[in-house]
Amino acid sequence: ASILVLMFLNLVLGSVSIPLKSVWNIICGLGDEPVTWQNIVWKSRLPQALTALVAGAGLAISGLQMQTVFRNPLAGPSVLGISSGASMGVAFVVLLSGSLGGVALSKLGFMGEIALSIAAVIGSLSVMALIVYVSQKVKGNVTLLIIGVMIGYVANAVIGVLKFFSVEEDIRAYVIWGLGSFSRVSGNQMMLFVAIMAILIPLSFLLIKTLNLMLLGDGYARNLGLNIKRARLLVITSAGVLTAIVTAYCGPVIFQIGRAHV
């Protein structure tokens, strides 16, 4: 219920305040509300609210999966460097593409956003593939966690080097993307994003039984017939893909606002 309340507040509040009744009429197609208000709701605030809702669901599931694997309430996709991988992918496109840099990509509009999204997905999945490979070679979760943190630092170091050789305009474009925002997702992008997440989120529910067994500890889970390495591979892959898609569309955002208070 609180999510719905916050969602409607997002539709009502802003630089232009729109009465709640008018927002309801616009969504339901009732009444004759000003065209300006209709454009604000349909083209800006509603896509932003739906994107935040779906992205939050995806990152919450991803965070839960990582917390279960490492049995640590502070674990998350960013710990394994997956978010840093997405940032690195975008950095290669924006900072090293010369005439196709951040300024030119912004002028391409939708196609520019698609290019950034693809770069973020490739970067995230590249780091995730490395993590998956390492997960098959190491036994302890703590070792894998440390390696993931190291990969994240390496990715950030690469980004720093790319910034050093880039022009001011491209660096500014990259920094804006790196702030993370739901507002830059257009209506068409939002529909594609929601469609992809509508497939990925139900698929992640198939791992509920596996996650419950992993909560018992590796010893108990193994005695109950669970293949620990295979389960860890599936969970990390699921968390990585969810994070990659969200980061591609929304930028590097944190999955849990209350994490700093734990």
Question: Where do the model's predicted regions map?
Answer:
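Alpha-helical transmembrane segments in inner-membrane proteins
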Residues: 1-261
